[in-house]
Amino acid sequence: MGKQETSIHLLKKFVPEGSFELIAPFFASHTIHLTLTHERKSVLGDYRNPTREQPFHRISINVNLNRYSFLITLLHEMAHLLVFVHFKHTVSPHGKEWKAQFRQVLIPYIGKGLFPADVERALIAYVKNPAASTCTDPGLFKALYRYDEPKPGHKLVDDLEPGQWFETEGGRVFEKIEELRTRSRCLEVATGRMYFFQGIIEVKLIPRQKGRIA
């Protein structure tokens, strides 16, 4: 799917039930072009400020996100919009001003039953010091991952048992050896070299083979 500008009313099919009524007044208060776009590996959403050529706020969100990830990403970008309105380009993108604004934007959505309990717990912990992306917070990422459309034969490294083999996107094969506090120590089967993997990386499970190439 390429980029597709969408009506605010189409948001209803992408966000949790009951949240659209909270979102709509924000869009009524600002001139925003909302775009749904294909999956982007390095970014879930994006905010662009008005320019002379395009005198309106622009927000884009990846259309492949589950409804809870979609809403959180949208709120993330709405906070960027408000920071621009108040500070223009005088503050850093994810500095204290954005963190404070994101908390304020998020508060009305907490405790309303819009998120599953596990996601809301992780979200409350995350928003105490929000990072530039939910992908960098293991607790929130794992909670949201549970609501993604299942991908057969794939798991997070954290969810593998020691001894299980897996394949990365690049086709390299590893065996999970040991789970540490924030990472897992894994052996590359072809070379015998050890590597450390973040627990929130999604990998493809493969059958364990007899012997090792290395």
Task: List the predicted regions and their residue ranges.
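Active-site recognition of the HExxH zinc-binding catalytic motif
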Residues: I72-V85
